[in-house]
Amino acid sequence: MNLKKLLQKGILPLATLLVAGTLSVSCSKDNEAFRPTPEARPAEPKVPPVKKSIGAATHKIVVNTEKGPGEKVKLLIYARETERSDVFIDWNNNGTYDEDTDDLVTKFERDYTKGASYTEYELKGRDFAVCGKVIRFAIMDEKIKGVDLSGNTLVKALALAGTKTLTLTGLDLSRQTDLRELLLQSVVLPSLNVSQNTALERLVISKTPLTNINLNNNVKLKSLLLNSNKFTSLDVSKNVALEVFACAGNQLTSLDVTKNVALQQFACTRNKIRTLDVTKNTELVLLYVGVNSLTTLDISKNTKVKDFDAGSNQLTSLDFSRLTQLEEVQVTDNRLTALDFRSNPNMKLVACSLNRISSAAYTQLINGLKVNTEGLILVFSEAANEQNEISDAQVTKLRSEKKWKVFKQKADGTIMQTTVGNQ
C-alpha cells in the first residue's frame, strides 16, 4: 500500500501552451511604370542578401554559466504571441541580433513544471542574454552562476531549478514588481528578498538552505510551498488569501495559521511543532500535520476535511465525529487508545499501526466502518514497539463482513496484506 504524501515537489500543475513563432522577409517589386528602358538602365551593383533586422534589445535577461561553448543548457521561454518575432538568444550579449551567431526563439512554452517543456540550446559562450518581451522564463541547470533580470521588468513567472544543486551569489527581483509566480528548487543562495514582489500569487521554494523569509508584503499569495528548506520560523499572518500552504521538512517549532482562514490544503509535516491551532481553518479539505511533536489537536471545526495525516506525533486521542466528509486517515505511530468512525461513512483508508488500541477498542473501530470493497486498513506493525491488539477473528470480520483489504507492516517497513492478527 502506498500511503500518499502531500505536494512532494512543491509545485502545482499549470496549463501548457505551445505556439511556434515564425519570421519571414518579404521583398517588393519595383513599379513597372518607373523602370528605365533596357538601353538606359545602368548596371546594378551587387547587393548582399537582406538579413532579418531586429532593433537593439529593449528587454533582456542575462545569464552567466560555468559552461563553455558546445555545452547545452535547458531553457523555457514564453512571450505573448504578438511579441514573439523579436525574441532571440544573444549569445555574445551585445544587445543586438546577429543572424550569423544568434538564435531566434521558435518554441514558446508556459509550463515550467514539466521537463518536456524545456528546450535544449547549445552554448556559444559563458554569458548570454534572452532578448525580447519575455514574460515567463525558466532554467533547469546546476551550472548557472548568475541571472540578471534588471533588463526585463515584464517577467511574470520565473523558475530556477538545478538538476543537482544550483548555486547563486544572489538574486535581485526588486524590479520585477509584476512577478506572479516564483519557483526556486535546489538553489543555494544566501538570502531572498521578495518584499517588492507584491503581485506574487504563487511562491515555491524547495531544497534550499534558506532559514528565513519575509512575506509581509506578499498579501496576494494564494499558493505557498516551502518544503525541504531550513526555515526556523515563518510568519504568514499577513498572507490571508492563502489557499494552499505547505512547509514540510523544515525546522519549525511553532506555526500560527489562525489568520489563514481561506486555507483549503495545509501541510506542515516533518517539523518540530509542539502545538497547533487549526480551529479557524474551517475550509480545509486536506490537513497533514504528521511527524511533529503534537500531544493534542482539536479538529472539531475542520468539518470539510477529507484527507487527514497526523502520523508520528504523541497524540492520545482524536475526535472525528464532526468530520463527516472524511475519507482517508493516517495516524500511525502515536499513543491512541481508540478510533471511532461511526460518523464517517465515506472512509476508504485507515492507517493506525503503532498505537495502543486494545482488542475491545478494535471491535468498536471495526463496527464503525462501513462496508467498502475499496477500503484499505493498516492495523498493526511487527515492530517491537507495537501495542495494538487485533485478533484473527477481527481481521476476518474486516475482510469478510466489511470487505476491506487488511494490511500489516513488517519489521523492515514493508507493507503487505494479512489474513491474521497479532493476538
Predicted regions and their residues:
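Concave beta-strand-loop units of leucine-rich repeat
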Residues: 138-143, 159-167, 183-189, 199-209, ...
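A short catalytic or substrate-binding loop motif that flags glycine-/basic-rich loops and adjacent residues
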Residues: 10, 81, 182
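N-terminal capping/linker segments that flank leucine-rich repeat
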Residues: 27-166, 172-177, 196-198, 219, ...
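Canonical leucine-rich repeat
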Residues: 147, 168-171, 192, 213, ...
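Composition-driven detection of intrinsically disordered, low-complexity segments
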Residues: 9, 13-14, 235, 256, ...
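Sec-dependent bacterial lipoprotein signal peptides
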Residues: 1-25
